[in-house]
Amino acid sequence: MCGISGIYNLKRNDPISGEILDRMLEAIAHRGPDGKQVMVFDRIGLGFNRLSFLDLKGGMQPLLNEDRDVVMVCNGEIYNYRELREELMAKGHVFTTKTDVEVCLHLYEEVGEEFPKKLNG
């Protein structure tokens, strides 16, 4: 199971500390020995310790969509990701990894908060 950390800042003026996210990930480093990444935006910071099963060289998270306006982290296994990926690619979505969880990002773009209903996993 991967490790996920996050900070959401309610105060627009206060910067989010990447250092704090790094320390959070260090505390759960045993959850993901295959890589670590932190992304900091205006009001949110996300961190991820990766435990790789699919797309061993790619697939680092957090993941961004094509327009870079949706970001996500996910720890899970999506059994029907191949079918969903084909459907989404037919609709014009561009995938940057071969991971199963990237379908969640693009499904969210398609159907919004109802996307989990389409997942088998």
Show where each model-derived region lies:
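N-terminus-centric sequence/structural signature that marks the extreme N-terminus
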Residues: 1-121
